[in-house]
Amino acid sequence: EISECLVGSEMCIRDRAEILEETNMAYINNDADAAVSVEAMERVIDKLKHELKKRHIDRLKKGECTIEQGFIMTDIITALERISDHCSNIAGCVEEIAHGSLGLHEYSREIDKMPGSEFYNIYKDKLSKYTAEL
């Protein structure tokens, strides 16, 4: 059954809802802190995408899923990950405006991602939250 191979997709949908809410808050309120949270969540979603694909391969090897089910799962996860990329782009623009910088990718590289930074702390919290659900 397809639902057995879509393990984790419900969690991805909840994660997508959370990043959309944070993006909306960042945009409407011009909230740079919410924008940093969006950037961190986007990184978590990227990591979860890779983990879910890896787990699907393990299920394939055990004969628990089919290749066809894998295509469906991959399409769903990829679409959800693209949504997070768009949210990240919006958040990056909010951060640029807040910090008076130009160039989305330039600013994205400048975000402090070292342990102890706001970005890092949010990333670790969200990663723990969503990986616990896998």
Regions found by a protein language model. Name each.
Residues 9, 19-41:
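Long, amphipathic alpha-helical stalk/connector segments used for oligomerization, subunit docking
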Residues 34-134:
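Long amphipathic all-alpha helical oligomerization modules
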Residues 1-12:
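Short, small-residue-biased leader/transition segments that mark boundaries at the very start
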Residues 5, 27, 81-82:
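Short conserved micro-motifs on helix faces and helix-strand junctions that flank
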